[in-house]
Protein backbone atom coordinates (compact mmCIF):
# COMPACT_ATOMS: atom_id res chain seq x y z
CA UNK A 1 0.00 0.00 0.00
CA UNK A 2 2.79 2.44 0.90
CA UNK A 3 4.45 1.70 -2.45
CA UNK A 4 1.19 2.49 -4.27
CA UNK A 5 0.87 5.79 -2.40
CA UNK A 6 4.47 6.67 -3.27
CA UNK A 7 3.94 5.87 -6.95
CA UNK A 8 0.73 7.94 -6.96
CA UNK A 9 2.44 10.94 -5.37
CA UNK A 10 5.39 10.65 -7.74
CA UNK A 11 3.06 10.58 -10.77
CA UNK A 12 1.09 13.52 -9.36
CA UNK A 13 4.28 15.57 -9.04
CA UNK A 14 5.28 14.74 -12.61
CA UNK A 15 1.81 15.69 -13.90
CA UNK A 16 1.94 19.00 -12.00
CA UNK A 17 5.36 19.78 -13.44
CA UNK A 18 4.21 19.02 -16.97
CA UNK A 19 0.99 21.01 -16.66
CA UNK A 20 2.74 24.01 -15.11
CA UNK A 21 3.69 25.14 -18.62
CA UNK A 22 0.77 25.87 -20.93
CA UNK A 23 1.47 26.19 -24.65
CA UNK A 24 -0.62 27.43 -27.57
CA UNK A 25 0.56 26.28 -31.00
CA UNK A 26 -1.10 26.63 -34.38
CA UNK A 27 -2.22 23.29 -35.81
CA UNK A 28 -3.41 24.16 -39.33
CA UNK A 29 -6.19 26.02 -41.11
CA UNK A 30 -9.66 26.20 -39.59
CA UNK A 31 -11.16 26.45 -36.08
CA UNK A 32 -8.52 28.96 -34.99
CA UNK A 33 -10.68 30.76 -32.43
CA UNK A 34 -11.77 27.43 -31.02
CA UNK A 35 -8.14 26.34 -30.65
CA UNK A 36 -7.16 29.56 -28.87
CA UNK A 37 -10.11 29.37 -26.48
CA UNK A 38 -9.47 25.69 -25.74
CA UNK A 39 -6.08 26.65 -24.30
CA UNK A 40 -6.51 30.16 -22.86
CA UNK A 41 -10.15 30.10 -21.68
CA UNK A 42 -12.40 28.00 -19.51
CA UNK A 43 -15.00 25.91 -21.40
CA UNK A 44 -17.52 27.96 -23.41
CA UNK A 45 -15.63 31.20 -22.76
CA UNK A 46 -13.92 33.54 -25.20
CA UNK A 47 -10.53 35.29 -25.03
CA UNK A 48 -10.47 36.42 -28.67
CA UNK A 49 -10.95 40.18 -29.22
CA UNK A 50 -11.36 40.69 -32.98
CA UNK A 51 -12.98 43.25 -35.34
CA UNK A 52 -15.02 40.62 -37.19
CA UNK A 53 -18.33 42.28 -36.27
CA UNK A 54 -17.52 45.31 -38.43
CA UNK A 55 -15.75 43.41 -41.22
CA UNK A 56 -17.71 40.19 -41.64
CA UNK A 57 -17.02 39.87 -45.36
CA UNK A 58 -13.31 39.37 -44.64
CA UNK A 59 -14.01 36.52 -42.26
CA UNK A 60 -11.99 35.67 -39.20
CA UNK A 61 -9.17 38.09 -38.41
CA UNK A 62 -6.94 35.44 -36.81
CA UNK A 63 -6.04 32.60 -39.14
CA UNK A 64 -3.40 29.88 -39.42
CA UNK A 65 -0.91 29.26 -42.20
CA UNK A 66 2.14 27.06 -42.77
CA UNK A 67 5.35 29.07 -42.43
CA UNK A 68 8.30 27.86 -44.49
CA UNK A 69 10.94 29.58 -42.33
CA UNK A 70 9.82 27.88 -39.13
CA UNK A 71 8.62 24.78 -40.99
CA UNK A 72 5.41 24.73 -38.96
CA UNK A 73 1.95 26.24 -38.70
CA UNK A 74 1.69 29.75 -37.24
CA UNK A 75 -1.01 32.27 -36.38
CA UNK A 76 -1.73 35.31 -38.56
CA UNK A 77 -3.29 38.41 -36.97
CA UNK A 78 -4.93 40.55 -39.67
CA UNK A 79 -5.76 44.24 -39.26
CA UNK A 80 -7.19 46.63 -41.87
CA UNK A 81 -7.05 50.41 -41.68
CA UNK A 82 -10.71 50.36 -42.73
CA UNK A 83 -13.23 49.16 -41.65
CA UNK A 84 -11.71 47.31 -38.65
CA UNK A 85 -12.49 48.84 -35.25
CA UNK A 86 -12.47 47.89 -31.56
CA UNK A 87 -15.12 45.16 -31.40
CA UNK A 88 -17.92 47.53 -32.51
CA UNK A 89 -17.83 49.38 -29.18
CA UNK A 90 -20.20 52.34 -29.38
CA UNK A 91 -18.41 55.69 -29.56
CA UNK A 92 -14.95 54.15 -30.01
CA UNK A 93 -13.74 54.96 -33.51
CA UNK A 94 -10.18 56.14 -32.87
CA UNK A 95 -8.56 52.71 -32.46
CA UNK A 96 -8.73 49.10 -33.60
CA UNK A 97 -7.98 45.82 -31.89
CA UNK A 98 -7.15 42.22 -32.81
CA UNK A 99 -5.84 40.51 -29.67
CA UNK A 100 -5.89 37.38 -27.56
CA UNK A 101 -5.51 37.36 -23.80
CA UNK A 102 -6.11 35.53 -20.57
CA UNK A 103 -8.73 36.89 -18.16
CA UNK A 104 -11.02 36.04 -15.24
CA UNK A 105 -12.57 33.15 -17.15
CA UNK A 106 -9.19 31.58 -17.89
CA UNK A 107 -7.73 28.67 -15.92
CA UNK A 108 -6.08 29.81 -12.70
CA UNK A 109 -2.58 28.85 -13.86
CA UNK A 110 -2.87 31.30 -16.78
CA UNK A 111 -3.39 34.41 -14.65
CA UNK A 112 -0.79 35.89 -12.30
CA UNK A 113 -1.42 36.54 -8.62
CA UNK A 114 0.57 38.78 -6.28
CA UNK A 115 3.78 36.96 -5.32
CA UNK A 116 3.91 34.62 -8.32
CA UNK A 117 6.70 34.51 -10.90
CA UNK A 118 5.64 33.79 -14.46
CA UNK A 119 7.62 33.21 -17.64
CA UNK A 120 6.00 34.17 -20.95
CA UNK A 121 7.47 33.05 -24.27
CA UNK A 122 6.37 33.53 -27.85
CA UNK A 123 7.56 34.19 -31.38
CA UNK A 124 6.40 36.90 -33.75
CA UNK A 125 7.21 38.37 -37.15
CA UNK A 126 6.42 41.79 -38.61
CA UNK A 127 6.19 42.35 -42.35
CA UNK A 128 9.33 43.72 -44.01
CA UNK A 129 7.53 47.03 -44.70
CA UNK A 130 5.57 47.30 -41.43
CA UNK A 131 4.30 50.84 -40.76
CA UNK A 132 3.69 52.00 -37.17
CA UNK A 133 1.91 55.17 -36.12
CA UNK A 134 3.30 58.07 -34.10
CA UNK A 135 0.58 57.31 -31.54
CA UNK A 136 0.61 53.62 -30.52
CA UNK A 137 0.67 50.13 -31.99
CA UNK A 138 0.72 47.66 -29.09
CA UNK A 139 1.81 44.09 -29.85
CA UNK A 140 2.04 42.84 -26.24
CA UNK A 141 0.81 43.95 -22.83
CA UNK A 142 0.93 42.81 -19.22
CA UNK A 143 -2.21 44.27 -17.74
CA UNK A 144 -3.97 44.18 -14.37
CA UNK A 145 -7.59 43.35 -13.74
CA UNK A 146 -9.16 45.23 -10.83
CA UNK A 147 -7.93 48.29 -8.99
CA UNK A 148 -7.75 51.94 -9.97
CA UNK A 149 -4.96 51.46 -12.54
CA UNK A 150 -6.49 48.60 -14.51
CA UNK A 151 -6.98 50.74 -17.62
CA UNK A 152 -3.24 51.17 -18.23
CA UNK A 153 -0.87 48.20 -18.74
CA UNK A 154 2.11 47.70 -16.45
CA UNK A 155 4.24 46.50 -19.37
CA UNK A 156 3.77 47.33 -23.04
CA UNK A 157 5.67 46.48 -26.19
CA UNK A 158 4.57 49.15 -28.64
CA UNK A 159 5.74 50.12 -32.12
CA UNK A 160 6.22 53.81 -32.85
CA UNK A 161 6.81 55.94 -35.92
CA UNK A 162 9.95 57.95 -35.24
CA UNK A 163 13.42 58.64 -36.65
CA UNK A 164 14.09 55.76 -36.87
CA UNK A 165 10.89 53.77 -36.30
CA UNK A 166 11.26 51.79 -33.10
CA UNK A 167 10.00 49.22 -30.65
CA UNK A 168 9.44 50.67 -27.17
CA UNK A 169 9.39 48.79 -23.87
CA UNK A 170 7.10 50.84 -21.62
CA UNK A 171 6.32 50.45 -17.90
CA UNK A 172 4.19 51.89 -15.12
CA UNK A 173 2.95 50.69 -11.70
CA UNK A 174 0.42 53.56 -11.62
CA UNK A 175 -0.80 55.74 -14.51
CA UNK A 176 2.40 57.47 -15.67
CA UNK A 177 4.06 55.30 -18.30
CA UNK A 178 7.77 55.59 -19.08
CA UNK A 179 9.86 54.15 -21.90
CA UNK A 180 12.56 51.85 -20.48
CA UNK A 181 14.37 50.92 -23.69
CA UNK A 182 13.97 51.10 -27.47
CA UNK A 183 15.02 49.05 -30.50
CA UNK A 184 15.34 50.11 -34.13
CA UNK A 185 12.33 48.57 -35.85
CA UNK A 186 14.49 47.41 -38.77
CA UNK A 187 15.85 44.72 -36.42
CA UNK A 188 12.33 43.25 -36.34
CA UNK A 189 10.98 43.90 -39.81
CA UNK A 190 10.90 40.71 -41.87
CA UNK A 191 12.48 38.58 -39.12
CA UNK A 192 11.06 35.89 -36.88
CA UNK A 193 12.03 36.73 -33.29
CA UNK A 194 11.70 34.78 -30.06
CA UNK A 195 10.71 36.58 -26.86
CA UNK A 196 11.26 35.44 -23.29
CA UNK A 197 9.76 37.58 -20.54
CA UNK A 198 9.97 36.79 -16.81
CA UNK A 199 7.88 38.72 -14.29
CA UNK A 200 7.93 38.42 -10.52
CA UNK A 201 4.61 40.00 -9.63
CA UNK A 202 4.54 42.09 -6.46
CA UNK A 203 5.42 45.46 -4.97
CA UNK A 204 8.98 44.16 -4.57
CA UNK A 205 9.00 42.45 -7.94
CA UNK A 206 11.38 41.98 -10.85
CA UNK A 207 11.18 42.08 -14.62
CA UNK A 208 13.30 40.86 -17.52
CA UNK A 209 12.82 40.46 -21.25
CA UNK A 210 15.02 39.13 -24.04
CA UNK A 211 14.39 39.13 -27.79
CA UNK A 212 16.42 36.92 -30.13
CA UNK A 213 16.34 36.47 -33.88
CA UNK A 214 14.83 33.01 -34.13
CA UNK A 215 16.89 31.68 -37.02
CA UNK A 216 20.31 32.90 -35.78
CA UNK A 217 19.71 33.04 -32.00
CA UNK A 218 21.27 36.53 -31.97
CA UNK A 219 20.16 38.65 -29.00
CA UNK A 220 18.88 41.96 -30.36
CA UNK A 221 17.14 43.33 -27.27
CA UNK A 222 17.32 42.72 -23.54
CA UNK A 223 16.34 44.50 -20.36
CA UNK A 224 16.38 43.45 -16.72
CA UNK A 225 15.44 45.10 -13.44
CA UNK A 226 15.79 42.90 -10.34
CA UNK A 227 13.98 45.36 -8.05
CA UNK A 228 10.87 47.02 -9.45
CA UNK A 229 7.22 47.48 -8.47
CA UNK A 230 5.31 44.93 -10.56
CA UNK A 231 1.91 45.13 -8.91
CA UNK A 232 -0.72 47.81 -9.43
CA UNK A 233 -2.58 48.68 -6.22
CA UNK A 234 -5.94 46.99 -5.83
CA UNK A 235 -5.41 44.50 -8.66
CA UNK A 236 -7.05 41.08 -8.45
CA UNK A 237 -4.64 39.52 -10.93
CA UNK A 238 -2.48 40.32 -13.96
CA UNK A 239 -2.59 38.76 -17.40
CA UNK A 240 -0.86 38.91 -20.82
CA UNK A 241 -2.24 40.15 -24.15
CA UNK A 242 -0.84 39.59 -27.64
CA UNK A 243 -1.87 40.84 -31.06
CA UNK A 244 -2.38 44.24 -32.70
CA UNK A 245 -3.97 47.16 -30.85
CA UNK A 246 -3.35 50.45 -32.63
CA UNK A 247 -4.48 54.05 -32.77
CA UNK A 248 -6.21 55.47 -35.84
CA UNK A 249 -5.37 59.09 -34.98
CA UNK A 250 -2.79 59.11 -37.79
CA UNK A 251 -4.46 56.63 -40.11
CA UNK A 252 -2.66 58.11 -43.11
CA UNK A 253 0.58 56.61 -41.75
CA UNK A 254 -0.86 53.10 -41.53
CA UNK A 255 -1.50 50.23 -43.90
CA UNK A 256 -3.24 46.86 -43.70
CA UNK A 257 -0.97 44.50 -41.77
CA UNK A 258 -0.47 40.84 -40.96
CA UNK A 259 1.55 40.07 -37.83
CA UNK A 260 2.53 36.44 -37.40
CA UNK A 261 2.72 34.78 -33.96
CA UNK A 262 3.76 31.29 -32.88
CA UNK A 263 4.52 29.10 -29.87
CA UNK A 264 2.87 30.99 -27.01
CA UNK A 265 3.89 29.69 -23.58
CA UNK A 266 2.85 30.63 -20.04
CA UNK A 267 4.68 29.01 -17.15
CA UNK A 268 4.71 29.73 -13.43
CA UNK A 269 8.24 29.16 -12.21
CA UNK A 270 9.90 28.76 -8.84
CA UNK A 271 12.85 31.05 -8.24
CA UNK A 272 15.95 29.48 -6.73
CA UNK A 273 17.65 31.08 -3.74
CA UNK A 274 20.93 32.91 -4.26
CA UNK A 275 22.78 30.03 -2.56
CA UNK A 276 21.20 27.60 -5.00
CA UNK A 277 22.14 29.83 -7.90
CA UNK A 278 25.74 30.02 -6.72
CA UNK A 279 25.89 26.23 -6.52
CA UNK A 280 24.53 26.01 -10.07
CA UNK A 281 27.04 28.60 -11.25
CA UNK A 282 29.99 26.70 -9.77
CA UNK A 283 29.90 24.39 -12.77
CA UNK A 284 30.26 27.17 -15.36
CA UNK A 285 33.59 27.04 -17.14
CA UNK A 286 35.00 28.86 -20.16
CA UNK A 287 37.33 27.58 -22.86
CA UNK A 288 39.77 28.08 -24.42
CA UNK A 289 41.42 30.20 -21.78
CA UNK A 290 43.61 32.09 -22.76
CA UNK A 291 42.00 33.03 -26.07
CA UNK A 292 42.38 35.66 -28.76
CA UNK A 293 39.19 35.08 -30.77
CA UNK A 294 36.21 33.41 -29.15
CA UNK A 295 35.38 31.99 -25.73
CA UNK A 296 32.72 29.33 -25.20
CA UNK A 297 30.88 28.70 -21.93
CA UNK A 298 30.06 25.23 -20.64
CA UNK A 299 27.18 24.33 -18.28
CA UNK A 300 25.57 27.75 -18.65
CA UNK A 301 21.85 28.09 -17.82
CA UNK A 302 20.20 31.38 -18.77
CA UNK A 303 17.60 31.00 -16.00
CA UNK A 304 20.35 31.26 -13.40
CA UNK A 305 21.44 34.80 -14.26
CA UNK A 306 19.96 38.13 -15.34
CA UNK A 307 23.07 39.61 -16.92
CA UNK A 308 26.68 38.95 -17.86
CA UNK A 309 29.21 41.74 -17.44
CA UNK A 310 32.89 42.01 -18.30
CA UNK A 311 35.57 44.13 -16.62
CA UNK A 312 39.21 44.71 -17.44
CA UNK A 313 42.00 44.49 -14.88
CA UNK A 314 41.52 48.16 -13.87
CA UNK A 315 37.84 47.56 -13.09
CA UNK A 316 36.52 49.33 -16.20
CA UNK A 317 33.31 47.79 -17.55
CA UNK A 318 33.57 46.49 -21.12
CA UNK A 319 30.50 46.47 -23.37
CA UNK A 320 29.79 42.91 -24.56
CA UNK A 321 26.07 43.18 -25.35
CA UNK A 322 26.58 42.52 -29.07
CA UNK A 323 29.50 40.15 -28.62
CA UNK A 324 27.76 37.48 -26.52
CA UNK A 325 25.71 35.09 -28.66
CA UNK A 326 24.76 31.42 -28.41
CA UNK A 327 26.79 30.94 -25.22
CA UNK A 328 29.92 32.27 -26.91
CA UNK A 329 31.80 35.53 -26.41
CA UNK A 330 33.72 37.21 -29.22
CA UNK A 331 36.92 38.69 -27.73
CA UNK A 332 38.69 39.48 -31.00
CA UNK A 333 40.03 43.01 -30.95
CA UNK A 334 40.30 43.14 -27.15
CA UNK A 335 43.61 44.28 -25.68
CA UNK A 336 45.81 41.56 -24.22
CA UNK A 337 45.53 40.97 -20.50
CA UNK A 338 43.35 39.76 -17.64
CA UNK A 339 39.57 40.27 -17.67
CA UNK A 340 36.77 39.29 -15.31
CA UNK A 341 33.43 37.88 -16.52
CA UNK A 342 30.65 38.34 -13.97
CA UNK A 343 27.30 36.49 -13.86
CA UNK A 344 24.59 38.45 -12.03
CA UNK A 345 21.24 37.31 -10.61
CA UNK A 346 18.95 39.69 -8.69
CA UNK A 347 21.87 42.16 -8.36
CA UNK A 348 24.00 39.43 -6.72
CA UNK A 349 27.25 38.30 -8.33
CA UNK A 350 26.79 34.54 -8.44
CA UNK A 351 29.91 33.72 -10.46
CA UNK A 352 33.14 35.49 -11.44
CA UNK A 353 35.46 33.96 -14.04
CA UNK A 354 38.96 35.04 -14.94
CA UNK A 355 39.55 35.39 -18.66
CA UNK A 356 42.95 35.86 -20.28
CA UNK A 357 43.17 37.51 -23.71
CA UNK A 358 46.35 36.75 -25.58
Label each region the model flagged:
Residues 216, 273, 314-316:
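Residue-level recognition of short loop/turn positions
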Residues 21-193, 199-271:
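Low-complexity, Ser/Thr/Pro/Gly-rich disordered linker/stalk regions
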Residues 10, 67, 112, 147, ...:
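Generic marker of residues within folded, mature protein domains
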Amino acid sequence: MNLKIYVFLFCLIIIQQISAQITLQADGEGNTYELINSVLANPNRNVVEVPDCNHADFGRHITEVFDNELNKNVFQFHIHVSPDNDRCKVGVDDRQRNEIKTYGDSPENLIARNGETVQYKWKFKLSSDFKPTASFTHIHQIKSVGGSYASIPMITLTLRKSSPDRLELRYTPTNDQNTLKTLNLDELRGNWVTVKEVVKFGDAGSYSIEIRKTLTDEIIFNYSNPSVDMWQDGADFARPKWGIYRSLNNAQDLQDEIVKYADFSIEEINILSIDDLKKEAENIVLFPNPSSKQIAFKNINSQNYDAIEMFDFSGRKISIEKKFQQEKLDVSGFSKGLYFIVFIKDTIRVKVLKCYIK
